[in-house]
Regions:
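Long, continuous compositionally biased terminal/linker segments
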Residues: 41-85
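Core segments of cupin and vicinal oxygen chelate
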Residues: 7-51
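N-terminal beta-strand motif that seeds the catalytic metal site of vicinal oxygen chelate
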Residues: 1-17, 73, 129-138
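Long, contiguous binding/interaction regions
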Residues: 22-30, 36, 52-53, 63, ...
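Short glycine-enriched loop/turn motifs at secondary-structure junctions
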Residues: 1, 66-69, 108
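Vicinal oxygen chelate
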Residues: 10-14, 74-114, 119
Length: 138
């Protein structure tokens, strides 16, 4: 299981607005400290996390944060409507559209996904594969 994801940023206030628009509606708790931004899903005592923590901070080496080519972080939403809502909220919070929410021929029929770039250029996917919702084949 992946325990956490760290995303580099050169502009933490812009990154804060972007990631809060996506992660708070998905149930993540937020805190801000000396090192940067922390988004953590609450975990009941005695249980294991169901998704990784997300940290957004300036790179430790002091060099500028750059987006990795081919690297992407995907966040699962419970419904297709939530994917659309989160995609819109992320655009309003400074994200760039990387592909409107919808089905893609290259993926399974029930995989509904939208793509974005955060304010630092990192690629983000928002997806739902809820079997109770329409698929590409419906």
């Amino acid at each position: 299981m992946i325990a956490y994801i760290t995303i580099g940023s050169n502009d933490l206030p812009r990154a804060k607005a972007f990631y809060q628009a996506i992660l708070l509606p998905l149930g993540y708790d937020f805190s801000e400290g000396r090192e940067g931004l922390s988004f953590v899903l609450p975990v009941p005592e005695g249980e294991q996390p169901s998704a990784p923590d997300v940290y957004v901070k300036r790179p430790f080496d002091g060099a500028p944060a750059t987006a990795g080519n081919g690297m992407m972080v995907a966040f699962q939403a419970p419904t297709q409507a939530e994917v659309r809502d989160l995609h819109g909220a992320a655009l309003a919070a400074g994200g760039q559209d990387g592909g409107a929410p919808g089905f893609r021929a290259a993926y399974s029929a029930g995989f509904y996904v939208g793509y974005l770039r955060d304010p630092d250029g990192n690629k983000i996917a928002l997806f739902s594969s809820n079997p109770d919702e329409p698929s590409r084949d419906d």
